[in-house]
Amino acid sequence: MSNPITITESAQSHFAKLLAQQPEGTNIRVFVVNPGTQNAECGVSYCPPEAVEATDTEYPFSGFSAYVDELSLPFLEEAVIDFVTDKMGSQLTLKAPNAKMRKVSDDASLMERVEYALQTQVNPQLAGHGGHVRLISISDDGVALVQFGGGCNGCSMVDVTLKEGIEKELLAQFAGELTAVRDSTEHDRGEHSYY
């Protein structure tokens, strides 16, 4: 069975050092809290032998194993754990592009594939401004109708974001399937607007 999680060599040696200071038989657990939602968060914790569940999947690495619970597993597809060192110091990074939404298969409907692209590629960028976008519908002639929410609602930059960012990205990714991306949101400026 292929391993959905990549742990870089620097992260593996970091974990090995940390685990050397723990009781024997301690490994790590990689998990997702609130998987499949906008509030999904990934984490790594120590996993002593008594905390291993029968439904966990074990992935062996250099000197330790990573355990993943059944619920988190599909949301950790293509996850990468790295240990990076720069001028500011060292830190562990965990990127899980599928944590908020389970990866869809290539033969999934256009609607599912576009929604997946919005959740995994577009919304993480909008989240910094407290905003998000969701797919409402796709017409027979390939026009995707989206709705902005949160900080995007009423933001004066939304047209630029839609045309230069979202539409460009989606039309390139779904060439031949999508023809345009339109905004269905009523943009009334309010306290919540980012700009």
Swiss-Prot record:
Domain of life from the UniProt record: Bacteria
Name of the protein: Fe/S biogenesis protein NfuA
GO molecular function: 4 iron, 4 sulfur cluster binding; iron ion binding
Primary role: Involved in iron-sulfur cluster biogenesis. Binds a 4Fe-4S cluster, can transfer this cluster to apoproteins, and thereby intervenes in the maturation of Fe/S proteins. Could also act as a scaffold/chaperone for damaged Fe/S proteins.
Assembly mode: Homodimer.
Cofactor: [4Fe-4S] cluster
Classification via SUPFAM superfamilies: Fe-S cluster assembly (FSCA) domain-like (SSF117916), HesB-like domain (SSF89360)
Protein's UniProt keywords contain Ion transport: no
GO BP annotation list: iron-sulfur cluster assembly; protein maturation
Residues that bind [4Fe-4S] cluster: 152, 155
The entry's keywords: 4Fe-4S, Iron, Iron-sulfur, Metal-binding
Pfam families in alphabetical order: Fe-S_biosyn, NifU
Lineage: Bacteria, Pseudomonadati, Pseudomonadota, Gammaproteobacteria, Vibrionales
Similarity-based family: Belongs to the NfuA family.
Co-factor remark: Binds 1 [4Fe-4S] cluster per subunit. The cluster is presumably bound at the interface of two monomers.
Keyword Metal-binding on entry: yes
